[in-house]
Amino acid sequence: MFSALKKLVGSEQAPGRDKNIPAGLQSMNQALQRRFAKGVQYNMKIVIRGDRNTGKTALWHRLQGKKFVEEYIPTQEIQVTSIHWNYKTTDDVVKVEVWDVVDKGKCKKRGDGLKTENDPQEAESELALDAEFLDVYKNCNGVVMMFDITKQWTFNYVLRELPKVPTHVPVCVLGNYRDMGEHRVILPDDVRDFIEHLDRPPGSSYFRYAESSMKNSFGLKYLHKFFNIPFLQLQRETLLRQLETNQLDIDATLEELSVQQETEDQNYSIFLEMMEARSRGHASPLAANGQSPSSGSQSPVVPPSAVSTGSSSPSTPQPAPQLSLGVSSTCPSAPSPVPSLEAMPSSVHSSAPAPTPAPAPAPAQRRSIISRLFGTSPAAEVTPSPPEPAPALEAPARVQNVEDFVPEDGLDRSFLEDTSVPKDKKVGAKGPQQDSDSDDGEALGGNPMVAGFQDDVDIEDQTHGKSLLPSDPMPSKNISLSSEEEAEGLAGHPRVAPQQCSEPETKWSSTKVSHPQKKRAPTRGTPPWSDGLTTDDSERPQEGKDKQVSSESDPEGPIAAQMLSFVMDDPDFESDESDTQRRMGRFPVREDLSDVTDEDTGPAQPPPPSKLPGAFRLKNDSDLFGLGLEEMGPKESSDEDRDSKLPSKEKKKKKKKSKEEEEKTTKKKSKHKKSKDKEEGKEDRKKKRKPPRSKEQKAADELEAFLGGGAPGSRHPGGGDYEEL
């Protein structure tokens, strides 16, 4: 039976296994499982008894909240279920088990196949779960006795069974089939008279009579309230058991107190002796850790002003030879029951090998251990052994005052840190250095285990500093702009960002040859709306002469500045290529005239290929500054070569330059021809590599005069930087 009950109140079985549950058993409701999972305080058992066909199973279903079934299906075995019920509005979790009891069960063997023959002996051999097999009143808290008011023999069953009910169990006699009252044969007065005259011993439980109808749920509310009596009775029994347990606990405690009164713990003289013995037993192990067991002082009272940062550093341990007498005279705040100082060194000396693995120390070393004793704190228990304890014992005895005493590395340095007395630094510099964990060791040599304020370089500091370089303006390249040109550059568009020099530095010698071509570029590309147009036009003859007489020491400053002013004044300069190179620029110093002007210079007479040095320019079609080259490149190259060879024809050159400026303004309107101009510019750059170097020596004086005239490039250019590299 108990195994069946465990299966009943256990976890719900899978739906596929419901068919395997034997008769009389069922799975528990999910809501009940969640409620009972928190813990059940009371288990109440209600038994429904009665003759056949009196409505026991109908009541059992109704208590579960199920519907009423008209047809009669005889119950073969006892059925048990749990229902929702609680006493009024209390929070007590009550598990109510309702038993549908069958007096005589019939267990039928269920076979998989068809029944072929009758075998009554086999059927009788199996036991059924019924009232004959179980004692249904065991641990029962309430009984519902049912009968049919239309059948007399059902009431006779009640008359037979009521005397068998235990006297302490409350009983509710329920007359069912109240909906068929016109056919009733048992009157309510007959039942009440029988209950009143029932012979029950005094102190027995209660009997109540009620009528019900399972068809229309009449009487269920009364029955629901009747369950309060079994519950309150169960609660009283539980409380009585708790009271009994409480009384037993009181008696046991009184007996323990009587025994405790006679023990040694209640004898004061014995208690004092035990305390003294315990204090002597704990003296030596605690002294090794730097504590005095009988006294509450764990470190000497040292004025904070007597300790400086340098003397409190872990690198300068200072022993105190005469500290034992000084501390005893200058520390009245320590508790009085301190052992005598004569007995203290002996106890400390006996436990000295624990913190310091050195051999037996000398008397001078013993005093240093005493200083070590008073200098330690509870923190010393965590790290009892310093890395180098030996130098502390061998240090000379020079401290003459308690104010000069410095505790050892057991104390927290921040506790006594003060910078008011700088004289301790002299004494601190003489002691050997020791490693420690404190952060005050920067006074002498720094503590390797503690980082400084900014020892680690943040990654953000490096990335920000590097990313800001390409966005710097051009004056960082030793190229200055006039005030007019700077105004145009700021009003028109952003300044030119430094461009990355993608050529190797090993081929820099070729740029010395290309200096004359660099000077010629501004004369061709300067727009007519530039403010510096008159200055550029007035200097055209000198530039024509510079092509022939420029030397390797040519400063290149004026031409570079003019080229830069032209580029910054050009509204069509904002190209994708320039934006890409502005983002890619990593070496802003590399931005020099070689990158600025070689791709925009006018075409020159192609020298013999044998004189060409190693290729320095890029082999791509890209125009760094987004400037369109004219289709008249070959014609201009021939004209400019003729002009460079004939420096006397300056007027003709001015006319040519004005014509080129007009062509430049027309070309800016048609940007779709830039790709074709880039190809021509690439061919022209290959032709202009080698100008005559013998004519470069004549340009120094004229460039100085040109610089003195207030040219925009008065500052020394960055070409010298490349030569130095």
Swiss-Prot record:
Superkingdom field: Eukaryota
Gene Ontology terms for molecular function: GTP binding
Protein family per UniProt: Belongs to the small GTPase superfamily. Rab family.
Gene: Rabl6
Region (Interaction with CDKN2A): 652-690
Name of the molecule in the record: Rab-like protein 6
Ranges of compositional bias, category Gly residues: 707-725
Region (Small GTPase-like): 39-279
Organism the protein comes from: Mus musculus (Mouse)
Sites bearing Phosphothreonine, chain numbering: 597
N-acetylmethionine carried by residues: 1
